[in-house]
């Protein structure tokens, strides 16, 4: 009795669905987008790094580097202050031919500057650790972007006060809109340089 009820409900289910012909299957199969079955659709779509995502990551990398530079500069100043504050200095004696307070201040400033210069090393490691999955694609896009910059930048030998070079290394480019504006600026620079020759 139970199996006959299952058969009856399955017959009703299949009877309510329209019959599918081979021609209908062929026509729908050609219009459906294909993807590999090795990854789900959400993983495949998110693994491709677009140019806008690249510029966002590039801006984030720059911010991380500046932040780490400020952090390491403060760290360098604090470490040098901790060392120099424990030294016994005779205020009547000169150090390197200068007043001791001047030498201590210069040492603190120099260690802060050294810390600031070492900051991007720390920042790049933080960026690599935080974006490990996209790092290979980011590096490939960065190489491709730098090739575009090298191919499209202008000759800086004909610059003047009235015709400055537009961002020779492309460091200020942070979006596709800014890249297009940079291309327009390069074209205007080249046109103006030809007119004045």
UniProtKB/Swiss-Prot annotation:
Transit peptide: 1-14
Keywords: Membrane, Mitochondrion, Mitochondrion inner membrane, Protein transport, Transit peptide, Translocation, Transmembrane, Transmembrane helix, Transport
Pfam families: Pam17
Entry GO CC: mitochondrial inner membrane; mitochondrion; PAM complex, Tim23 associated import motor; TIM23 mitochondrial import inner membrane translocase complex
Membrane topology, as annotated: Multi-pass membrane protein
Localisation: Mitochondrion inner membrane
One of the GO biological process terms: intracellular protein transport
Domain of life of the native organism: Eukaryota
Membrane-spanning ranges: 64-84, 103-123
Subunit and interaction comment: Component of the PAM complex, at least composed of mtHsp70, MGE1, TIM44, PAM16, PAM17 and PAM18/TIM14.
Additional notes on this entry: Present with 3000 molecules/cell in log phase SD medium.
Function: Component of the PAM complex, a complex required for the translocation of transit peptide-containing proteins from the inner membrane into the mitochondrial matrix in an ATP-dependent manner. In the complex, it is required to organize PAM16-PAM18 (TIM16-TIM14) heterodimer.
Family: Belongs to the PAM17 family.
Protein name, entry field: Presequence translocated-associated motor subunit PAM17, mitochondrial
Organism for this UniProt entry: Saccharomyces cerevisiae (strain ATCC 204508 / S288c)
Gene: PAM17
């Amino acid at each position: 009795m139970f199996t006959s009820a299952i058969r009856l409900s399955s017959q009703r289910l299949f009877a309510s669905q329209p019959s599918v012909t081979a021609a209908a299957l062929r026509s729908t199969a050609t219009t459906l987008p294909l993807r590999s079955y090795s990854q789900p659709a959400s993983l495949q779509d998110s693994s491709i790094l677009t140019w806008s995502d690249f510029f966002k990551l590039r801006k984030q990398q720059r911010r991380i580097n500046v932040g780490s530079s400020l952090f390491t500069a403060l760290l360098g100043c604090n470490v040098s202050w901790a060392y120099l504050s424990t030294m016994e200095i005779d205020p009547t004696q000169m150090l390197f031919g200068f007043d001791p307070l001047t030498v201590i201040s210069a040492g603190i400033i120099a260690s802060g500057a050294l810390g600031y210069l070492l900051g991007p090393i720390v920042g790049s490691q933080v960026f690599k650790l935080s974006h490990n999955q996209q790092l290979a694609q980011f590096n490939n896009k960065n190489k491709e972007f730098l090739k575009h910059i090298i191919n499209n930048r202008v000759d800086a030998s004909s610059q003047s006060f009235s015709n400055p070079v537009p961002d020779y290394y492309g460091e200020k480019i942070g979006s596709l809109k800014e890249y297009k504006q940079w291309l327009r600026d390069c074209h205007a620079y080249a046109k103006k340089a030809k007119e004045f020759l």
